Amino acid sequence: MTDDSPVNLSAGLPETLLPAPPEEWAEDLARASTQSGPGRFHALRAAAGRHPRHLEAWATLAELADDDVDSYAYARVGYHRGLDALRAAGWRGSGYVRWRHEANRGFLRCLEALRRSAGAIGESDEEERCALFLYQLDPGMGANAGS
């Protein structure tokens, strides 16, 4: 009897790549993003409601919210949805989730928004934990975020 399983000889941490969201989700978010005025945020919220597992939608809401508590809430939803997605993709609580993989960016944006909004509402311990987690997931992200 032979074992045809691949052998991972890497001594480094594993890297997780989230699957790309369905194209219709991205298109829906893109349409919502083209709205102008107060209708834009409403359209983005509606898109998140139609596709609650779309991490980019939660990240966008967190980044655009005009209230720190709202930003925190949107970021936290995206963060927890992202943890669920990471686990489904094989992540076991450690290893890299790199910014260079576009499909990972929604989760990383949510985590960055959570870090920022936690600091804004005085949750400095959570802000520090999020900063450390971001560094552990992708030590080079600071230089790449936003690109």
Where are these regions (language model features)?
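Short, solvent-exposed interaction modules
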Residues: F107
